[in-house]
Curated annotation (Swiss-Prot):
This is Translational regulator CsrA. InterPro entries: CsrA, CsrA_sf. Homodimer; the beta-strands of each monomer intercalate to form a hydrophobic core, while the alpha-helices form wings that extend away from the core. Keywords: Activator, Cytoplasm, Repressor, RNA-binding, Translation regulation. GO terms for biological process: mRNA catabolic process; negative regulation of translational initiation; positive regulation of translational initiation; regulation of carbohydrate metabolic process. Its main location: cytoplasm.
Length: 64
């Protein structure tokens, strides 16, 4: 895992077309902005996992 330090307003690049910008820090929460082409899906991890479990039909954690 690559670990980077960024300040508010600073950006990092992922490949040539994806940027991640630190928008703000409040306590232990960080607000980030992601710019990516429409064909690149961007999800929070818990949402991505739910999408994947719905695709396979295996409910996660018994919440269904």
């Amino acid at each position: 895992m690559l670990i980077l330090t960024r300040r508010v307003g600073e950006t990092l690049m992922i490949g040539d077309e994806v940027t991640v910008t630190v928008l703000g820090v409040k306590g232990n929460q960080v607000r980030i902005g992601v710019n990516a082409p429409k064909e690149v899906s961007v999800h929070r991890e818990e949402i991505y996992q739910r999408i994947q479990s719905e695709k396979t039909g295996s409910p996660e954690g018994g919440n269904y």
